[in-house]
Amino acid sequence: MKFSKTLLLALVAGALAKGEDEICRVEKNSGKEICYPKVFVPTEEWQVVWPDQVIPAGLHVRMDYENGVKEAKINDPNEEVEGVAVAVGEEVPEGEVVIEDLTEENGDEGISANEKVQRAIEKAIKEKRIKEGHKPNPNIPESDHQTFSDAVAALRDYKVNGQAAMLPIALSQLEELSHEIDFGIALSDVDPLNALLQILEDAKVDVESKIMAARTIGASLRNNPHALDKVINSKVDLVKSLLDDLAQSSKEKADKLSSSLVYALSAVLKTPETVTRFVDLHGGDTLRQLYETGSDDVKGRVSTLIEDVLATPDLHNDFSSITGAVKKRSANWWEDELKEWSGVFQRSLPSKLSSKVKSKVYTSLAAIRRNFRESVDVSEEFLEWLDHPKKAAAEIGDDLVKLIKQDRGELWGNAKARKYDARDEL
């Protein structure tokens, strides 16, 4: 049985008419008492939801993730959702639309608090550069929205007041929720992103919290071009921040944190703009230093980043179209960088690495060779390692031995032309 919208409104309003569940509060500026239902009463238009109101199930809810202000209305399944994310971007000054301060704006004494919040949100949306093309997911549970709002509030409390007691719980929640595209877009706003970066740089914050902050950044941006665009168009120099944090974690031998930071950096280096910044900051040198001194897991993470970023022809072609300081310094930077990495990987494969990491390193090296053949100068030491299959099999496992066998002639030349041809079983 389907209820009409009119009947639904009548039922909700009738239930509240008894006045049993009403919330009253005093406005800070005017001292006037205002009252509203404990359970939000929806209409067909967007209305602001007070922080302590209960939102009935089945409504269409949207939220300004920077300050936690929510709006809701009756969900119309036939309605076309506008192609914008409601999350507020980076241009509104901090604190301008915080809900607690909205009742204190000058010249607004005759306007209700609800209307003030509406005006503030409308003003914020007009002043934002909101990314077109993303339709907010209406199927995200309200409980997730509430959890996210509370976690972002904990970030804000840390950034503004230095309160870190709730960070571990908040970061754990954000790490889990940041895989959702809508929440990833929200976390790419300047304030939450800067709070996460501040956590990474704060010597007083424990390593586990820093790891969760790095993973949250990475998950927010991975496969989320809308979020990445917001970061690129903001004033946050995320590439520099992550490279600086990586250099520091390398000095401190904090390998688990380094691995998480590499994960975050790999999510950022997906556009010509971010790769250009990586070049400007000599990011390859930072990663090579990390690779040489880091744990097996760090080496695996770095090799995967190189495969996903530098060994990708499409991104290389986009980068090649960029002119300016980067190209003036080195017209062949990309190829030179790949030569450096192919040498690093060839030298490390015969060394004592776990079979899992050797598989990642070899896969990255093979991708470079396959897509940028001239960027790999094959070394004798590496070929000797390839030409001792029994030794290689003991080090890398049967699966990678099979892969090398498939690649041998195509990527590394004819093994029978070498002195180990009689022993070549690959």
UniProtKB/Swiss-Prot annotation:
Keyword Phosphoprotein part of the UniProt annotation: no
UniProt keyword Endoplasmic reticulum, yes or no: yes
Gene3D superfamilies: Leucine-rich Repeat Variant (1.25.10.10)
Protein role: Required for protein translocation and folding in the endoplasmic reticulum (ER). Probably functions as a nucleotide exchange factor for the ER lumenal chaperone KAR2. It is not required for viability but is essential for optimal growth at elevated temperatures.
Protein name as catalogued: Nucleotide exchange factor SIL1
Gene Ontology MF terms: adenyl-nucleotide exchange factor activity
Positions of short motif Prevents secretion from ER: 423-426
Disulphide bonds in the chain: none
GO CC aspect terms: endoplasmic reticulum; endoplasmic reticulum lumen
Gene: SIL1
Listed GO biological process terms: protein transport
Family indicated by similarity: Belongs to the SIL1 family.
Domain of life of the native organism: Eukaryota
Induction: By the unfolded protein response (UPR).
Protein keywords: Endoplasmic reticulum, Protein transport, Signal, Translocation, Transport
Pfam families: SIL1
PANTHER family: NUCLEOTIDE EXCHANGE FACTOR SIL1, PROTEIN FOLDING REGULATOR
Assembly mode: Interacts with KAR2.
Signal peptide: 1-17
Compartments it resides in: Endoplasmic reticulum lumen
